[in-house]
């Protein structure tokens, strides 16, 4: 869509956006004193919003912007007048290949905290750039859903805070019995006083030894990338735009320059982001940049992108002082790609930041560095980026936030839905590229029992999985064929097993994109393989695993598409299983396959 915006001049209000689709009718609430509360109706997208404004002490409610639907209703109520809305971000996209674009998710940030995300965090990311302003009104487009959203902002008068600085940053250790502990001490001045932040952590023998440094005598040099190829912005077609840096003004400046893409990012952190090191791609060659920041991080993160199919599109984060009224440093970082979200890494405290460009890829970093990563900015190359599903369940971004709306019933054992991109995730090494598991065209499992094939349908509405102590006993599927429900026969034995799981999808908004599992013999003396575990991946997340994850792993990893039917072999157990896939090749073209593991690039 076309982005229209006007920026504030000399403290005057500004309008930004709208972000989203072109459908629906335009609306504009106008400008008020502040926002008091927001009511959001949402499900697979944002159905509607309604806002309570304040106008010179009087409450004013807007009309409901959007449709009458919504499976969930949330109210964001600010602590007026002390709390006010400073930023909004979210995603927009279509529910299916042919659908119109609307707002899929929204997150609101005040001067105190974040609220959300509400909806499904899927599609193209957008964000209001941080500019020291507060939101005083909304505008956009609306129909059956909230099709697009924009904001009116008003600059906030700046306060004159006393200057302060960090004087000393040290890392020390002490022994207690046979254990060794390390701690980080930061000392900073506020007038004539000191504030101290202490971080304790058990020593990790794999980490390098730490050293004490005084900021006045720290040996900091301006880094330059070491490469045999001279690079400049003019050598990259189309040039690039620079956003930021955001954060503090301490340390010295660095600029890695402009490359073709980003392959990997290594972070070191404790109370803030201590350092960052980036592996770039320059015309097919991996080029490592220098480490920017200090030493002494207690936590190390490695973010490996599946380059070139996975592209870094946005960098967001927060910054703030390490102590009361101290200088600002980067506190947290989140990396968004065309496949999902990596992070956040660090504590999301303080003002947030992002760059405004909707379509493009990050091709370089810049900022300021000292004992910490003081600030960060990005070079962005404007281009069209396609939104892709992860190429393998191994690469799925799976935060532990199961606040979704999809339904799973009768689940006494290992029955869960894990959203693929929503909320805060467990901080592990994300996006680590793993080789796909070798497998044939399916079905996967043993060659015992009788072959069966349900055929191809319009979609899948629900699945019943019955498991025994050591294998999947049976599976039964409810399909959709042109709006009519069609049940398959039960594939497998008649035993009730240990547990039966009902996986009910939000059809037609939710579709199965991949299955994975394990197969192997029932016991060491059995020469026949059966399916021992199953997991189902949908457009919203992952269901399972159901059964014991032992034996040989298999997956139906493929290009973007959806599962329209199952086939396999069965006897007293589910001996083998395969899928019928409908693959999307772009321009609304599709084709069917009975296999699933062949790369189609």
Curated annotation (Swiss-Prot):
Keywords assigned by UniProt, alphabetized: Lectin, Repeat
InterPro entries (UniProt xref): Jacalin-like_lectin_dom (IPR001229), Jacalin-like_lectin_dom_plant (IPR033734), Jacalin-like_lectin_dom_sf (IPR036404)
A GO molecular-function annotation: carbohydrate binding
Ranges of residues in domain Jacalin-type lectin: 13-155, 240-382, 438-583
CDD domains named among the record's database cross-references: Jacalin
Record carries keyword Repeat: yes
Family membership noted in the UniProt record: Belongs to the jacalin lectin family.
Protein name according to UniProt: Jacalin-related lectin 3
UniProt lineage: Eukaryota, Viridiplantae, Streptophyta, Embryophyta, Tracheophyta
């Amino acid at each position: 869509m076309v982005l229209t915006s006007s920026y504030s001049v000399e403290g005057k209000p500004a309008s930004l956006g709208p972000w989203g689709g072109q459908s629906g009718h335009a609306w504009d609430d106008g400008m008020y004193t502040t926002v008091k509360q927001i009511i959001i109706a949402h499900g697979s997208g944002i159905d509607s919003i309604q806002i309570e404004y304040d106008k010179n002490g009087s409450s004013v409610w807007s009309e409901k912007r959007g449709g009458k639907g919504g499976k969930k209703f949330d109210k964001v109520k600010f602590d007026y007048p002390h709390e006010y809305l400073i930023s909004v971000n979210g995603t927009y996209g279509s529910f299916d290949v042919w659908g119109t674009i609307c707002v899929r998710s929204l997150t609101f940030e005040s001067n105190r905290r974040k609220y959300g995300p509400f909806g499904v965090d899927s599609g193209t990311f957008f964000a209001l750039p941080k500019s020291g302003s507060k939101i005083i009104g909304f505008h956009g487009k609306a129909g059956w859903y909230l099709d697009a959203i924009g904001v009116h902002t008003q600059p906030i008068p700046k306060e004159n805070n006393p200057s302060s600085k960090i004087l000393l940053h040290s890392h020390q250790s002490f022994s207690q019995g046979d254990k060794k502990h390390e701690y980080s001490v930061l000392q900073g001045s506020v007038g004539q006083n000191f504030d101290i932040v202490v971080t304790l952590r058990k020593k990790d023998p794999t980490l390098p030894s730490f050293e004490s440094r005084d900021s006045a005598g720290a040996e900091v040099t301006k880094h330059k990338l070491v490469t045999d190829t001279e690079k400049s912005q003019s050598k990259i077609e189309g040039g690039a735009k620079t956003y930021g840096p955001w954060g503090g003004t301490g340390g010295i400046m660095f600029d890695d320059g402009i490359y073709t893409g980003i392959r990997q990012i290594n972070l070191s952190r404790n109370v803030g982001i201590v350092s960052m090191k980036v592996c770039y791609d320059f015309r097919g060659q991996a080029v490592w940049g220098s480490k920017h920041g200090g030493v002494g991080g207690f936590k190390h993160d490695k973010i490996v992108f599946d380059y070139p199919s996975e592209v870094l599109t946005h960098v967001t984060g927060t910054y703030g002082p390490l102590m009361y009224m101290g200088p600002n440093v980067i506190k947290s970082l989140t990396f968004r790609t065309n496949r999902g979200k990596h992070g956040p890494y660090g504590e999301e405290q303080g003002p947030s930041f992002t760059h405004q460009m909707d379509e493009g890829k990050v091709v370089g970093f810049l900022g300021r560095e000292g004992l910490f990563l003081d600030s960060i900015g990005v070079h962005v190359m404007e281009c069209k980026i396609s939104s892709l599903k992860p190429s393998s369940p191994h690469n799925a971004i799976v935060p532990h936030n199961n606040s979704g709306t999809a339904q799973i019933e009768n689940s006494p054992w290992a029955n869960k839905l894990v959203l693929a991109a929503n909320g805060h995730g467990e901080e592990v090494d994300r996006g680590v590229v793993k080789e796909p598991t070798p497998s044939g065209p399916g079905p996967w499992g043993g060659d015992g029992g009788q072959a069966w094939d349900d055929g191809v349908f319009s979609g899948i509405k629900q699945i019943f999985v019955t498991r025994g102590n050591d294998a999947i006993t049976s599976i039964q599927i409810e399909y959709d064929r042109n709006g009519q429900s069609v049940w398959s026969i039960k594939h497998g034995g008649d035993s009730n097993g240990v547990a039966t799981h009902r996986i009910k999808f939000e059809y037609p908004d939710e579709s199965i994109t991949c299955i994975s599992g394990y197969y192997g013999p029932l016991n060491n003396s059995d020469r026949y393989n059966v399916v021992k575990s199953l997991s189902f991946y949908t457009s919203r997340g992952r269901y399972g695993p159901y059964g014991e994850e032992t034996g040989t792993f298999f997956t139906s990893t493929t290009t973007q598409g959806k599962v329209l039917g199952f086939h396999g072999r069965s006897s007293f157990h589910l001996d083998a299983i395969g899928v019928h896939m409908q693959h999307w090749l772009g321009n609304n073209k599709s084709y069917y396959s009975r296999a699933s593991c062949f790369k189609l690039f």
